[in-house]
Amino acid sequence: LKMEGIKEESVRQVLKLVNVVGYSLALQKKIVRGLEVDVPAIRVYVSRKIRPLEALAVEHRIPESIEGIKTDVIEVGEVVALAQRLQVPFFGVPPEKRTQIWRPAPPGVSIGHYQISAGTFGCLMADAVSGDPLIVSNNHVLANADMREEHHAVKGDMILQPGPYDIRTGINPKIHKIGELDRWVPVTSDPAAAETVDCAAASPFGPNVLSQILDIGDLDDIGKEADFKSQLPLCKSGRTTGYNESKIADATAYIKVSGYHGKTCAFRDVFFTTQCAAGGDSGSAYVWKSLERGKVFMGLLFAGSSSVTVGCKSFHVVGRLKMKLLKGLPPAPPPPPEERLIEFSTDDGQTWEQAKTLRVRPKED
């Protein structure tokens, strides 16, 4: 715990209190009237503040200090896994193209295990030994929120693009299957055994995927622990809210997240950003555009609320899934114009055979 000698066990006691959903794992500047002031504090996250304070039983009030350090109570709302269809604010209309069939499919579009709703294809990585490409997203996107306590997925499960929620004419594996579940880290509902990641990887079929993240491009590096700093600017490309930017609000936190088969799961050493996502954006890759290192993979977006979004860190993800940066995969060249299939939506009434007859006309000079 990066709190100058304070025992985390002392801080963890606040999780027993009403509405407490997490805490920062490092001392933070206290927030007063929306602005940070130069007073170190232990940040405690609650789903909502009870006002007036007198309405809250004394035994459920967060102490004003822990081991002599002031506490700072921050209201973040209910934090939920964002592959579910949730009532959280949207940034305009969901980008419709991202919910269509894409072949080859770029990161940033709809994807999912055949038993979920829909999430986001985060990025393309490589197996650390073989170098084979891997589709990377969240456990609750690619592995149906498989848990240590109860299993919901097996290796080889069908991965669909777009995700099931976006397939309106019935799932056809010949059309929609893009790969198979290969590896994942089970999540847990045990608050004392919190995970650091919600991540999984799938093996794609042949040349059906691209490495260039939609609206971002190829990754150049993987974030290190020292890179995670408050106010670091990040961007992401997601199924629902498309491309947008945010900043790190807490570089290391413990948080309880609901939406895992009706259970709440615990995560530690994850990071918060300013709100940048909605239901269906889970699995999006957080990217830092560094002047020195290029586009740096910083982690996977996996949860959020009406005021914050939560990511698991890149170095945890690649370490646990035994992956490395994918290099040397050139963009797939487009076929000749007369042979190129147009992109089409699965909810427009077309059959696959009808769609195959549609061609893109060559541009006229």
What are the roles of these predicted feature ranges?
Residues 4, 8-19, 24-35, 41-46, ...:
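Protease-domain processing segments flanking chymotrypsin-fold serine proteases, especially trypsin-like
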